[in-house]
From Swiss-Prot:
It is an enzyme of class 7 (translocase). Its EC number is 7.1.2.2. One of its GO terms (molecular function) is proton-transporting ATP synthase activity, rotational mechanism. The lineage of its organism: Bacteria, Pseudomonadati, Pseudomonadota, Gammaproteobacteria, Alteromonadales. ATP binds at residues 169-176. This is ATP synthase subunit alpha. Keywords: ATP synthesis, ATP-binding, Cell inner membrane, Cell membrane, CF(1), Hydrogen ion transport, Ion transport, Membrane, Nucleotide-binding, Translocase, Transport.
Amino acid sequence: MQLNSTEISDLIKQRIEQFDVVSEARNEGTIVAVSDGIIRVHGLADVMQGEMIELPGNRYAIALNLERDSVGAVVMGPYADLAEGVKVKTTGRILEVPVGRGLLGRVVNTLGEPIDGKGPIDNDGFAPVEVIAPGVIDRKSVSQPVQTGYKAVDSMIPIGRGQRELIIGDRQTGKTAMAIDAIINQRDSGIKCVYVAVGQKASTIANVVRKLEEHGALANTVVVVASASEAAALQFLAPYSGCTMGEYFRDRGEDALIVYDDLSKQAVAYRQISLLLRRPPGREAYPGDVFYLHSRLLERASRVNEEYVEKFTKGAVTGKTGSLTALPIIETQAGDVSAFVPTNVISITDGQIFLETNLFNSGLRPAVNPGISVSRVGGAAQTKIIKKLSGGIRTALAQYRELAAFSQFASDLDDATRAQLEHGERVTELMKQKQYAPMSVAEQAVVIFAAEKGFLKGIALKKVGDFEAALLAFMNAEHANLMKLINDTGDYNAEIEAELKAGLDKFVATQTW
């Protein structure tokens, strides 16, 4: 066979022209140790802190420890089939999750993947889970309310849009119930919600999702799940993922509410990761940066000004402020709020709602202790009518607790003291509220007005609940226009006061409770 040199050169030229290769410079390393969800990798010289490392089987790990000879990374998912000698690659990017309106009404995992069986999610792109919080210049003061629907909270511990309000208490004191009711109450308020479940039983999360659906609030909510059975890395990252999903709405001039349930379990997951990475332990075996773990998360909840929104949307949205309100939950052990994580989160947040076991067991639900619960910035955001009327409620309850303790030792009480005690008892009874029954501003105003103006005087203690239910039914039926006016404006003036008084006088005359 005769080889023609011209043919060969033409063939080589043709092959060279057709040759198409995509060259991608990627750092490759080898796993040298695997244990408890932590891998140690040798050879990743160019890896960044927090960078995603690609593992076989479409899985990823996150580089957390950058050491001289190796990299300590935490695996996001199952790791049983990983072994020494397995090759891994850097990706050059940090963890991102899908964001957008398509997530509303869906249940997703830490990585934003759907786990509700409703098919793929139509997202508006991806955003990094770790973002620096807006600076001082980008922020605006809190001045609009977030109505939780709870009389005890909205009257005494008001929450504003862009605030961080901690819900703290022992297990089984109604912390999750309060947060879920706050989400249900946003059904028609236009506030988008994100519920982040960290380290909880799958059955508990399923129950929460079912309740949100029953009350028509799931369509307005993103549920992010990192259950107790999932890897510690996913539990540690879930709050950051949820925060990124909530920031999507804040940065576009809308209002969002995020619940972290709960940050104690996130801190435990982070402690586990840190100890496995052989980082030095500190108080209660938590690592030294556990404060930063929560502060960098909670600082992202804020109210941003019009300029920030306009700049972020490149002029598509103008004249609107955005907000992300956070309700972190912390579980205490035997009421010990001076433990490490509770004190950290109390110092980071703008106030706290203390729920107490004794109050819960005595039948006072929500079990809010108004003496040590506080809202540091919410007062400026409180609805005008509630602010005007509720001033005496906290005072009445504080005096009642003081006198109740004193009256145990005093045999005879003067009339003024007895009247104060009776008023305090009735106000305490009035603050009780059933789960999944949030109240509108007008309903709260009517009930507080009745307490403030002495309409509860002479009503038997066990009849206070019946009085309240009958009063609200009467006002909604007979004074619907007034109730609508209060709900729409939140205003309080002499005219509204006169109409409220006339309505209550008329109701008391009926004696229908």
